[in-house]
Amino acid sequence: LGFLEKAAKSESPFMMYLAFNAPHDPRQAPKEFVDMYPVESIALPSSHMDMYPYKDSIGLGKKLRDEALAPFPRTAYAVRKNIQEYYAIITHMDAQIGKILDALEETGKKDNTYIIFTSDHGLAVGHHGLMGKQNMFDHSVRAPLILVGPGIPKNKKYKQHKLFSLLTNY
């Protein structure tokens, strides 16, 4: 935030790159964010399974990295606890991003700033008997890409196949 305050005093353009660790493991959000998501109120994913049925047939068995995130069989409590931690760390990260957006507003730079938000992957957190990212289900591979800034239409959604032309237009 100090950088934004300093950059706001200059007429020169600036670039700021932030790489949040969240929500990667270990997912350790402050308690106030964890408490926002009581375990007992979290629904299990509709595709929840206690076991990932293909771990042995794909030749991984106990070597499946997912096994380290929560042992099989996956209890309802273990899945809910993982979801709670995932939601909490994302909410905490969102609060930090909010501070940056507030600082851009307060310094008068918001309307002249491009913001690009993306992620490298999602997590299964209980879907299909999995917890991690090493799979090709939508929850793991459909990462967000949000662009905001001068000349970028608001509330416009693009399909994945149009991503390249979207990026070359801006």
Residue ranges, per PLM feature:
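Active-site-proximal cap/lid insertion segments
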Residues: L1-L166
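Feature captures the catalytic ectodomains and active-site-proximal regions of enzymes
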Residues: T168-Y170
